[in-house]
Amino acid sequence: MARLSVVILNWNGRRHLERYLPSVVEHTTGQAEVVIADNNSTDDSLVWLRINYPDIKVIKLDKNYGFAGGYNRALKHIDSDYYLLLNSDVEVTAGWWQPLVEVLDRESDVAVVAPKLRSATDPAMFEYAGASGGFIDFLGYPFCRGRILSAVERDEGQYDDSRDIFWASGAAMCCRASVFHALGGFDEDFFAHMEEIDLQWRMQLSGWRIVVEPRSTVYHLGGGTLPPSSMKVFLNHRNNLAMLYKCATPWQRLAVAVIRPFADGVEALGYLLTLHPHKAWAIVRAWGQFLVWHRSLAHKRKAIRRTHSVRGIYRHSIVLRYLFGARSFKNMM
């Protein structure tokens, strides 16, 4: 049994594996192992792995279950104390995983530890997906230490302290295996996007903490700064609304019900005015799917174990703060 399993979920990602897997294999030694979970790839990923890394454990899934379902199924076959979920487009360096395990070993009430994420294409900059730890505002909009909406900061050591956060990016998150399984893992209805924040919110409602440990730094290629596809817009909006309905307090849900339709309507109008009608329609479809899910979400909400109040939700609007000039996390707090 490994202390730590670094699990990379792959779907048609041969080019990312070829570019980034060598650093992961080189710097993941000792009591840690590397596992590839494959979401039924149709490219030559598995052939390439068999030729170049014949000793790596590969878990083959029978179809593409997305991020949520793929990890849920793969992790059932991995016997380890801790899982380090890692995107296939992440580069690591020597000593990258040990600080994360040290936190979990030392602090028994921590469920997830995040490394600091820098950009693989511009290493002096934070990376959009997670930077130095994630938060959300009361309307459910995510932001990071190092990234406010689309404004990404340069990493000058300003967020190098280890501290509690609200969420760790699914691009690189180290979690306690027992807690992951006890809470049922990711919500597979999400398929992809927001599922890691949803899980970590549920963890906090059960009394667990989420922490960032910047002594561990990884470099993520990512796609957060690229123009989002209509599918990404749809998944982000639908899953965000579902997460809020499941996890938020009644007062927060009331605020979301009153304000979010207007805010999302303004966003959809912006897409229309900039000649992106498919993205505007994606927001409409997201609300429609959310309403269809209403009954099943009510059951999920009742099933969540709520023994603790969750702190760390930003009580103001990140969007308004951004519109009034806030471009760094330090300006927010």
Task: Please describe what each predicted stretch is.
Residues 60-78, 88-90, 99:
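Glycine-rich, basic loop-to-helix element that forms the pyrophosphate-binding segment
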Residues 23-31:
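Short, acidic, metal-binding catalytic loop of nucleotide-sugar glycosyltransferases
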Residues 160-217:
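A short, conserved alpha-helix in the catalytic core of glycosyltransferases
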Residues 83:
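Short aromatic/hydrophobic "clamp" motif used to bind/position activated sugar donors
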Residues 7, 206-302, 307-317:
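Active-site-adjacent helix/loop segment of glycosyltransferases
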Residues 23, 38-47, 63:
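A conserved acidic beta->alpha catalytic loop
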